[in-house]
C-alpha cells in the first residue's frame, strides 16, 4: 500500500492546498495514460453524527455532512491553480476530484482501522495461496508489523503484509 515516488511527491504537494479547503486528503491516483494522464484526488470529511448542527455559507443547516459538489469544486480550483504554477506533471492531464464513495479505495494502512469487521476487496502484488484477488472480512490491522488479518470466505484467516497489497477497496453493504 505504498505510493509510487511520483504519486508521493504529488500527494505531498497537494495536501496543504486540500486541507486549506477544510477537507481531508484521503488519497490520490496518478495514472499516466499515453499523451494524457489522469490525476484523481479523493477528499473526505469525517461524518460526526454527534456534532452540533452548523449553518453553512448558504444559510442551510448541516449535520455531520460528508463531501458535497461544492467541496469538490473548491478543491479543484485550489489544486488546479497550484498545479498550473508548479507544473509537476509533464504533458496534458485531467484533474478529477471526488469523495471516496461507498466503495472507497484505501491508500494507507491506517485508513483500514476504521473498517474492521467489514468486507474488503484486495488485489495483491504476489499471490497468497495461489490467488491475487480476495474478497474478505477485515479482522485486524497491525500497524507495528504493517499487515492486516482477513477472513476469506468465512473459512480461514490470512495475514497479509501491507507491502503486498496493490489495491484495497471497501465493499459496500446495506
UniProtKB/Swiss-Prot annotation:
Biological process terms in GO annotation: ribosomal small subunit assembly; translation
CDD domains per the UniProt record, alphabetical: YlxS_C
Signal sequence, renumbered to the chain: none
Assigned keywords, A-Z: Cytoplasm, Ribosome biogenesis
Domain of life, source organism: Bacteria
Presence of keyword Hydrolase: no
Record carries keyword Cytoplasm: yes
One Gene Ontology term, aspect cellular component: cytosol
Subcellular locations according to the entry: Cytoplasm
PANTHER family: RIBOSOME MATURATION FACTOR RIMP
Family designation: Belongs to the RimP family.
Biological role stated in the UniProt entry: Required for maturation of 30S ribosomal subunits.
Name of protein: Ribosome maturation factor RimP
Species this chain originates from: Acinetobacter baumannii (strain ATCC 17978 / DSM 105126 / CIP 53.77 / LMG 1025 / NCDC KC755 / 5377)
Lineage: Bacteria, Pseudomonadati, Pseudomonadota, Gammaproteobacteria, Moraxellales
The encoding gene: rimP
Amino acid at each position: 500500500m505504498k505510493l509510487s515516488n511520483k504519486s508521493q511527491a504529488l500527494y505531498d504537494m497537494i495536501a496543504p492546498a486540500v486541507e486549506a479547503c477544510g477537507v481531508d486528503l484521503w488519497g490520490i491516483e496518478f495514472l499516466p495514460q499515453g499523451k494524457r494522464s489522469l490525476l484523481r484526488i479523493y477528499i473526505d470529511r469525517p461524518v460526526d453524527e454527534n456534532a452540533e448542527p452548523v449553518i453553512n455559507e448558504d444559510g442551510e443547516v448541516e449535520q455531520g455532512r460528508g463531501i458535497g459538489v461544492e467541496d469538490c469544486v473548491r478543491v479543484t480550483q485550489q489544486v488546479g491553480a497550484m498545479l498550473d504554477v508548479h507544473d509537476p506533471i509533464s504533458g496534458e492531464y485531467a484533474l478529477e476530484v471526488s469523495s471516496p464513495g461507498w466503495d472507497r479505495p484505501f491508500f494507507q494502512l491506517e485508513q483500514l482501522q476504521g473498517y474492521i469487521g467489514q468486507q474488503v476487496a484486495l488485489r495483491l502484488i504476489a499471490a497468497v495461496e495461489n490467488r491475487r484477488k480476495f474478497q474478505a472480512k477485515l479482522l485486524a490491522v497491525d500497524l507495528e508489523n504493517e499487515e492486516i488479518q482477513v477472513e476469506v470466505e468465512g473459512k480461514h484467516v490470512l495475514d497479509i503484509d501491507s507491502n503486498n497489497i496493490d489495491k484495497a477497496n471497501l465493499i459496500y453493504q446495506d
